[in-house]
Amino acid sequence: MAYQNALRWKIGGTKENADAAVRILMSWANTCKGVGGDTNMSLAAGIYGHEFANAAELMRDYEGWSAEDFTKFKQWIIKVFYNPSIDFLRRRHDTWLNARYSSLGERPGHYWSNWGLCNALCVMSIGILCDDVHMYN
């Protein structure tokens, strides 16, 4: 709902849309401490991380979002989404190190391309949000 409210505000919505988007983004930043679970957390981090980053990017110039809260949000998104996404892109849960093939047909680096793509999109989106060329590249 943060993205929908942010987009609605950006294309001519009301202050209520903007306030709702910021409230939702900051509620997540103040509550969520990480993405957990099995290896599927990498897929979740990639998908949801870029969605949060895009919503925040739309709200970047909203006067109702304080610089302090915007900075806090960026720190949160790096910790919760950027770090696991870049780790997946670098290590792929160490499946590249696994040289043996299983009877299930798994190969080293066996994750489907959508896993890498959504994590690359997450990393790039957060790099843009944080104005960080190193992250983006």
Where are these regions (language model features)?
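Aromatic-lined, polymer-binding surfaces characteristic
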Residues: 1-137
